[in-house]
């Protein structure tokens, strides 16, 4: 192969590398099927992961009973909201509502709010229905169906269980302060996202 021919072949290969690949705007595509697409969607989407973790931190701060109530309420509400989103999908964005959940839950964790178990469970129900509906509508558009939703709820259940149990087990004062600092970071992320959503509007 002559140097000129080699350069041409290299230029063609480089040009082919610059061709755009298909992109997916909202849902992750692992190639492993809808269940794992749902799992990866939850773990890689901050709009879903961070409010769920903030709720787990809040529930863990209030003790094991509150943690258990919030865990099951959040998971079941997320599933119910997701099924509603699959059945009656809407194309509307709820960025402001999801970022308010960052702010509210992160602020409650940072303040170490002494909420009764019923209030934390109510917050879990509202969060689960809102985010579940949005996930269900996205699953409907991506044709992942109920199996993708089950993947999301499974990942949610595991994450909330682990985080709430970790916080319940913390006894050292510095560790409790670290939980509050984490809540303030989540609230700050929510504030940034809220500002960004108004800027884009």
Where are these regions (language model features)?
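Membrane metalloprotein/metal-transporter helix-bundle signature
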Residues: 2-201
């Amino acid at each position: 192969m002559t140097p000129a021919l080699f350069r041409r072949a290299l230029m063609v290969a480089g040009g082919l590398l610059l061709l755009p690949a298909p992109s997916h705007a909202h849902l992750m595509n692992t190639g492993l099927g809808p269940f794992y697409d749902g799992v990866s969607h939850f773990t890689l989407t901050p709009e879903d992961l961070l409010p769920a973790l903030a709720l787990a931190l809040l529930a863990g701060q209030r003790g094991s009973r509150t943690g258990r109530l919030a865990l099951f309420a959040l998971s079941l509400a997320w599933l119910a909201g997701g099924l509603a989103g699959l059945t009656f999908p809407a194309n509307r964005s709820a960025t402001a509502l999801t970022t308010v959940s960052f702010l509210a839950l992160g602020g409650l964790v940072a303040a170490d709010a002494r909420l009764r178990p019923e209030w934390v469970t109510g917050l879990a129900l509202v969060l689960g229905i809102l985010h579940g509906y949005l996930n269900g509508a996205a699953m409907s558009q991506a044709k992942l169906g109920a199996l993708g939703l089950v993947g999301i709820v499974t990942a949610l259940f595991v994450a909330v269980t682990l985080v709430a149990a970790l916080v319940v087990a913390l006894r050292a004062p510095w560790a409790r302060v670290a939980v509050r600092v984490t809540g303030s970071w989540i609230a700050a992320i929510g504030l940034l996202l809220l500002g960004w959503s108004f800027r884009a509007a």
